[in-house]
């Protein structure tokens, strides 16, 4: 429909309808498995905080890419309920992804994966930067990708798009 809004602000009632309260039949798989591709040796706090925040939402399981020994040790020391994996994200069984926070050039492959993942994904920081280039190359993020940039990341994102196609703006 041409008049269907592309953006909508949710109110309290919308959230009540969308969020399921766990009951006695709930378990980790019914509550959702979230894959996390966050953090780096330079920014380990991004991994620790994002995983802790995810765990605090009530998600059933968090699977964290812990291919770096140091980051994996930190993660399990702070968040022992986290399940770490070391292989490619494509081999993991998750319901959704979150990533990009605290990532750097060494995790470029993870951010690329988020852009193409068949599962829904929340893209932050480094993944937002990569998303602009991805879009300008003619690719689509699809309807299940959410960008969560802070003001500086949003400015870089929009600047890249504007520089590539100024006539669109």
Task: Cite the ranges covered by each PLM segment.
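Small-residue (G/A/S/T)-rich helix-start motifs and N-terminal tracts that mark the onset
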Residues: 1-122, 129-146, 151-169
